């Protein structure tokens, strides 16, 4: 089954499917660990297996025709190409928050945000991957790495960007116990955003898709979903957002408008369900300390104080620039008081005809910036030094933002710059995308 034109898909999996629980993880009452015959785990997460190859790219059969047994089986087919076996493992460690209560009685859940590099984009923008061996760009190879990584992580919620083979992913994730929802970009684009959630942990109360083309903001899309924690005595709900912001650094007005619109719509939906806490995931295509990042963190921005081409900070993150200035580069933007903003650009950016101020109603914090990390992996504001690496970019553009009502209990630390540089560019033999997966475990704030 293939996507044709625009696609909005929502799937659920039969109740017989089991969760896959890694050793050392937090187990919720009522869940049982299943045998993991062909998968191995460490106390610190290993994001890549010791061997891999690409599964078939054939279309999965209709989910309605599948049968499921109670005995868990690895949803990934056997590897068949020993010449594609990774020679090493890249380890990432969990970092616990030193400020969040650690009581196991607190209800918790784990969220992943992952730009998986669309198959079409990896082919169309081949110049970005000039240092990557062709076999490691093949979707079959990368799909296996990505799915194995996610199965090892065993998150409760997954938000993906650049998804253009949704049904390939869904067939595997469904067998691992996930339900899913997909929103394709508008226009002629073939990729979009996807959400997956553990169907035995969360139920979906409401979903909303955002097409930014309806507001004159290009063909990007975003997703919102109200999820309710099952088997909770307190009717816990969260609002999950997922976005892939426009890449083009020159169109800061559109990038700002997309983020502003997502925050506004998330606020309305959260209010509708009783001011429920919010988690916003995605590739925001903006770097730490950039005006766009500061807009998310501070809730407002005077656009006339900035050049719209510098709102995202991306132009300062070419690999040669980052490596020349060192891993502690400040990504400082040279602000200019610009008269180059047109009335239409101001309207798109701020949502108003006669105001230079863009604002959003949320109080957001970044989960990674909230959990103290290592100088080898974090910048001066606490964000990862790099979440994405290809021949023209080395830096951070991916984030997990959260609102009041939630606290980050721990995050999966990213990789040091020197480790990333040894790959000469992502994806590589061990990593299936040009982005790293961001992972945060959240707890609900204790009541009163």
UniProtKB/Swiss-Prot annotation:
Nuclease keyword on record: yes
Region (Disordered): 50-92
E.C. code: 3.1.13.4
Biased composition, class Low complexity, residue ranges: 50-67
Reaction it catalyzes: Exonucleolytic cleavage of poly(A) to 5'-AMP
Broad EC category: hydrolase
Binding locations of Mg(2+): 162
GO terms assigned for molecular function: metal ion binding; poly(A)-specific ribonuclease activity; RNA binding
Keyword list, A-Z: Cytoplasm, Exonuclease, Hydrolase, Magnesium, Metal-binding, Nuclease, Nucleus, Repeat, RNA-binding, Transcription, Transcription regulation
Domain of life of the source: Eukaryota
Annotated localization: Nucleus; Cytoplasm
GO CC annotations on file: cytoplasm; nucleus
Cofactor: Mg(2+)
Function: Acts as a catalytic component of the CCR4-NOT core complex, which in the nucleus seems to be a general transcription factor, and in the cytoplasm the major mRNA deadenylase involved in mRNA turnover.
Subunit field text: Component of the CCR4-NOT complex, at least composed of CRR4 and CAF1 proteins.
Family under the similarity heading: Belongs to the CCR4/nocturin family.
Protein name in the entry: Carbon catabolite repressor protein 4 homolog 3
Top-level taxonomy: Eukaryota, Viridiplantae, Streptophyta, Embryophyta, Tracheophyta
């Amino acid at each position: 089954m293939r996507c044709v034109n625009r696609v909005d898909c929502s799937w659920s999996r039969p109740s017989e499917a089991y969760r896959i629980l890694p050793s050392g993880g937090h187990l919720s009452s009522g869940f049982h660990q299943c045998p993991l015959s062909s998968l191995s785990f460490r106390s610190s997460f290993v994001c890549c297996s010791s061997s891999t190859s690409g599964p078939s790219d054939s279309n999965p059969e209709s989910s309605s025709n599948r049968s499921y047994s109670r005995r868990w089986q690895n949803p990934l087919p056997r590897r068949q190409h020993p010449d594609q076996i990774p020679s090493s493992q890249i380890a990432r460690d969990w970092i616990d928050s030193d400020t969040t209560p650690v009581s196991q009685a607190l209800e918790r859940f784990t969220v992943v945000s992952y730009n998986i590099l669309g198959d079409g984009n990896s082919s169309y923008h081949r110049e970005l991957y000039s240092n990557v061996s062709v076999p490691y760009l093949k979707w079959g190879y990368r799909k296996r790495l990505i799915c194995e990584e996610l199965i090892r992580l065993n998150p409760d919620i997954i938000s993906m960007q650049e998804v253009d083979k949704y049904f390939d992913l869904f067939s595997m994730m469904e067998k691992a116990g996930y339900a899913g929802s997909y929103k394709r970009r508008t226009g002629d684009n073939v990729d979009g955003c996807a959400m997956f959630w553990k169907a035995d942990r969360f139920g979906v109360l409401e979903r909303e898709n955002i097409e930014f083309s309806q507001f004159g903001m290009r063909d990007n899309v975003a997703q919102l979903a109200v999820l309710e924690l099952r088997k909770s005595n307190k009717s816990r709900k969260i609002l999950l957002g997922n976005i892939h912001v426009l890449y083009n650094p020159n169109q800061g007005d559109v990038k700002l408008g997309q983020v502003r619109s997502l925050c506004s719509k998330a606020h309305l939906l959260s209010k509708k369900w009783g001011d429920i806490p919010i988690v916003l995931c995605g590739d925001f295509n903006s770097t730490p300390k950039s005006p766009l990042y500061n807009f998310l963190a501070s809730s407002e921005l005077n656009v006339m104080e900035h050049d719209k081409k510098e709102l995202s900070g991306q132009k300062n993150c070419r690999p040669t620039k980052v490596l020349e200035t060192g891993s502690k580069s400040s990504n400082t933007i040279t602000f200019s008081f610009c008269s180059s903003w047109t009335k239409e650009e101001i309207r798109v950016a701020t949502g108003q005809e006669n105001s230079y101020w863009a604002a959003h109603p949320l109080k957001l914090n970044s989960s990674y910036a909230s959990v103290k990390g290592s100088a080898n992996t974090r910048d001066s504001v606490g964000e990862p030094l790099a979440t994405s690496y290809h021949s023209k970019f080395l830096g951070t553009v991916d984030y997990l933002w959260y609102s009041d009502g939630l606290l980050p209990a721990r995050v999966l630390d990213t990789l040091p710059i020197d480790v990333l540089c040894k790959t000469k560019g992502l994806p590589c033999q061990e990593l299936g995308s040009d982005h790293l997966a961001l992972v945060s475990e959240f707890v609900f704030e204790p009541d009163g």
